[in-house]
């Protein structure tokens, strides 16, 4: 179940509620929010993949039901974005960067189809463990782990969020397995 916090128009309360059981019978793959506070839910139901957008108010005052803005069936490359995917929402571009092994995909999530071509391909052996962005969303920071590297196996790569081009030299072998990349303004 997905529980949301906010105003429940059915009983005029602020609390956690189970999205009116809308997602019962579905396997939840990932949940994320867009720049406007709308919740996007990627699910599987009966071997079909769906992207559902829930309005930021969660409930419709007209129907007192979950405010489903849209639900789209995804039919292309559906398994690339999965429960193990590391992802980062880029609000200015209305896209989602997500990792699969050593590749980063850039999905414009207002389109239901997931791209088949990687936006960024990291060197062989690198496995994406975490991502973050600069405050202006122009740089994407990718923390990786390479089990075949001697010594420290964690690395940091920095890319331009718009072009996918590498910025500077990678910081290879600078950490153990990274779990989080943080951006700090100087």
Residue spans of the language-model regions?
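C-terminal structured domain segments
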Residues: 119-170
